[in-house]
Amino acid sequence: MQEATEPPPPKRKNKGTVVAPKGHGTLQAIDISTNGPVEIKYHLNLPHALEKIMQVNLLTLPTNLTPQRLRTLDSSGLRALVLELRPCRAEVWTCLPRGLVSMTTIETEDGHADADNIVEREVQAPSLNFPLKFLVKGSQVQLIHEVHPVNRCEYCGRLYKHKHECSARRREFYFHHINSHSSNWWQEIQFFPIGSHPRTERLFLTYDVETYTWMGSFGKQLIPFMLVMKLSGDQRLVNIAYDIAMKLKWDRWRQDPQTFYCITPEKMAVGQHFRQYRDQLQTALAVDLWSSFLKANPHMHEWALEHYALTDPTDLTFEELKKLPHVRGTPRFLELYIVGHNINGFDEIVLAAQVINNRAEVPQPFKITRNFMPRAGEILFNDVTFALPNPAYKKRADFQLWEQGACDDIDFKYQFLKVMVRDTFALTHTSLRNAAQAYSLPVEKGCCPYKAVNQFYMLGSYRAEKDGFPLEEYWKDHEEYLLNRELWEKKSQPRYDIIQETLNYCALDVLVTAELVAKLQESYAHFIRDSVGLPHVHFNIFQRPTISSNSHAIFRQIVYRAEKPNRTNLGPGLLAPSHELYDYVRASIRGGRCYPTYIGILEEPLYVYDICGMYASALTHPMPWGTPLNPYERALAVREWQMTLDDPATISYFDKDLLPGIFTIDADPPDEFMLDPLPPFCSRKGGRLCWTNEPLRGEVATTVDLITLHNRGWRVRIVPDELTTIFPEWKCVAREYVQLNIAAKERADKEKNQTMRSIAKLLSNALYGSFATKLDNKKIVFSDQMDESLIKGISAGTVNIKSSSFLETDNLSAEVMPAFEREYLPQQLALLDSDPEDSEDEQRSAPFYTPPAGTPGHVAYTYKPITFLDVEEGDMCLHTVEKVDPLVDNDRYPSHVASFVLAWTRAFVSEWAGFLYEEDRGTPLEDRPIKSVYGDTDSLFVTQRGHELMETKGKKRIKKHGGKLVFDPDEPDLTWLVECETVCVSCGADAYSPESIFLAPKLYALKCIYCPACHKTSKGKLRAKGHAAEALNYELMVNCYLADMQGADRQRFSTSRMSLKRTLASAQPGAHPFTVTETTLTRTLRPWKDRTLAALDAHRLIPYSRSRPNPRNEEVCWIEMP
């Protein structure tokens, strides 16, 4: 029985309207010869169009021009067609990339074509008395019907005949992505999660060196004689490092099996030994990574032999290895950290000529990249990466893991071994002893007499007691001498062994640094998990070199979590100014105040008030957010701003109708009787940053500054400028970051957790600095590490080599010097106190004593002849390269945030000025009482009258009376607090200095601090930047001022201190790369001479104004008179 089949479904009828094909096409483009927009209307059917135009002119096409031939005609056959038709003029419009067209002519009669556009010449009588125009699109040829000019919208770029619709979205897109002039002004900020890979294997090599002074050809050079290192981290990597140390015969410190040392006075010997160890260690780790890669890809042997005739895959290059198919295996990530305290500015430079080696014998398939960046005399980066392909790498589609701050295998293009140098001082900003206390680490009592050690290595002896213990002159003070003597006597040793004692103290410092490394790792990871709220993050504080870079990474992670942009950047809300806009935004970043308004001795009460966490409070205020407006919307916003500024009424900082932006402005001050000693703005027009009451011309300022100037009575005019930037909205972008740190600090205070308090305070203060980071187009590279793009840039002239330096190396000639035959003058041998506890270089010179021969009680030591190696090698060359284009490419820092942070701080100080000086406005400046005598960026020194005004008018801003430190968007208001810094150490009440002396900016002294409540007196305050502060006192500064006023010889008032001159890469002939030399800095002590204020009388200074103009300002400014 057959089954019934289902009938087929009914055939669907197509519905629609049949239309005839279009006969014409339209093309709008820019004519490159006139730079004007044109519209080209052309025929879509070339055979039909040519036939019709011939018929209109009562002509026929040649018989050989068949429709088939014309239909298949391309650009290569166009010339033959024109010569066959011979029109009186033949134009060829060729389509170019990016919406451009060019017009050329094919001449068929001599003298009838444009001489500038002739591409062919053929002298023959025309057969057509009308012109022909052809359009070439790719290889296709069409006949043009007509070409006529059209209009172009300057805001959206659309071409039109009469009118068009210009949408806001199109205007934004055209301004930021199409317009060649402005499309690179703002760049998206790249983002990668803050955490590191969870399977990262780490090895830490913590070290410290001790040096002595050697008189060389480049001055008093510091030479290492001792190096102690400790190994820690993943046990398997520690075992590898341990075996290499034993193989190279490093001495083990008896108190810790993982600590090794090397002692030798030979110049460069310590560096060579350390370099050899570091080279072999990184080679061993690289081989370990390569072995695991080989094991996971056994087919590589056969593939290398088949494609490159290599029996050993180790001979492959990285470019060849990238072509390996079907790469397998789990990627590995190894990190080797070379860590020390305050090594970037000293130890790494001293050792760098020996330890920097670009020829370590790592397997050839690795891609080797180096990130080397010296900055301000320190090695900020010195990282080397050995990379292999990562088989798991792919483009990320889901970004939820990134929002949690974590990453996995697919996010890394390469598996790698990274060798990085890290300085714990850059992460703590304090001495090792202070850092140990801040992070609750045990610290051994006592210290080492480094002055005696230095003298011992220089001369072979030092002054000592009978048992060899250094005399009191080598110690800081009598108490230190007694303490260390007592500690040594407890060891019950017959004689004091200065080398052994130095080794023990150096090793203990290394152990403390190693404990600090572990504590920093653990504490910061805990902070990120608990305080920041990222429990899945494997955070490693040493992944980034400084506290500033870590704070910026935390900030970016918080923004990414909040905004969820689902991309590899922070999205359009927070952009980085670049190229022309970078320089424009940098022009709006103005530093803080620091100058006295009183020179001389002030004999009246003086209180010091300081803003609490000024930058942190400013960061919580609204900042610009979003993609900057296009010129059309920008013009409307500027008009709104100017109308508001023309109204004399007070403007609110938080008016929602006024958008944030950065403008070029002119501003005129009010009448001089209405001016204040604290101007609302500053200018660099005279070459020096001056806080001035003069008219401002062509200054770049934020909208916050416009409000501050307006509310202080200034008349502000916005100057038209194409670089003017206005943002679509305000947003408290950094408020969450600051709140997290403040909450963590308060919680740490309650729990008495000094470690977490230190972390929160450091991170809170570091963020502003990262926004203000200044970039340039310079970089320093090793000659054999120049990549292909850099070499091409140098060849093309887009990159210049500014200077080249060669490193001192160790493998050619040698000079043998018998033991201490050279004679030294005492002044040549001012010794350096190389105490590793001290992170500053402002140390007094040590006393020097030359012992007579055979003096009893001295420790004498005779060295064998010392070998000094001092040569150059051509390939150890550093190049400083710089782009020819001065414009900076920035995709990292939203610099405009720094500009607004500083603008908010100026708003704080402007309100502060209102408390103090509002009652004086209308009175001539010379008749006003003194209310403040010194101003710093975040502090004011006020008199008794100023103190009374702060307790009345400014009461809401004094911290002890309550108040907020974090801006509240629901109740917008300026949010800042101050506290009196001069407080009684006994009862805590506000105290004052009854007498003070002011000589210059950052050069002043308060005689003492007197408490009117309990009538107790405590130590005063002295500030002397650039001087050896321990050599100064209040009486000396008073004598200096009085001598200057009386015309006495002031040269006798000076201070001297020992300083370290660090040279990394320099074009100076007298400075050798990678050396640290010791110099003596002598500074004259005198009152301020090159003042940036005008003198009102013998003591009082006031800002420049119309009646007292800045004599440095010679800039000519055009002003149109109405």
From Swiss-Prot:
- Additional comments on file? This DNA polymerase requires a protein as a primer.
Enzyme superclass (EC): transferase
Q: How does it assemble?
A: Heterodimer with the terminal protein; this heterodimer binds to bp 9 to 18 of the genome. Forms a complex with viral pTP, DBP and hosts NFIA and POU2F1/OCT1 for initiation of replication.
Q: Which keywords does the record carry? A: DNA replication, DNA-binding, DNA-directed DNA polymerase, Host nucleus, Nucleotidyltransferase, Transferase, Viral DNA replication
Recorded catalytic activity of this chain's protein: DNA(n) + a 2'-deoxyribonucleoside 5'-triphosphate = DNA(n+1) + diphosphate
Protein's job: Eukaryotic-type DNA polymerase involved in viral genomic replication. DNA synthesis is protein primed, and acts in a strand displacement replication. Assembles in complex with viral pTP, DBP, host NFIA and host POU2F1/OCT1 on viral origin of replication. The polymerase covalently transfers dCMP onto pTP, thereby initiating complementary strand synthesis.
Looking up InterPro entries in the UniProt record yields: DNA-dir_DNA_pol_B (IPR006172), DNA-dir_DNA_pol_B_adenovir (IPR014382), DNA-dir_DNA_pol_B_CS (IPR017964), DNA-dir_DNA_pol_B_mt/vir (IPR004868), DNA/RNA_pol_sf (IPR043502), DNA_pol_palm_dom_sf (IPR023211), RNaseH-like_sf (IPR012337)
Task: Name the source organism.
Answer: Human adenovirus B serotype 7 (HAdV-7)
Q: Does the keyword Transferase apply?
A: yes
Identify the main location: host cell
Q: Where in the cell is it found?
A: Host nucleus
The family line of this record is: Belongs to the DNA polymerase type-B family.
What does the organism's lineage look like at the top? Viruses, Varidnaviria, Bamfordvirae, Preplasmiviricota, Tectiliviricetes
Tell me its EC number(s), please: 2.7.7.7
Q: What protein am I looking at?
A: DNA polymerase
> Which molecular function term from Gene Ontology is one that the record holds?
DNA-directed DNA polymerase activity
What is one GO cellular-component annotation here? host cell nucleus
What is a biological process (GO) this protein takes part in?
DNA-templated DNA replication
> Where are the annotated coiled coils located?
none
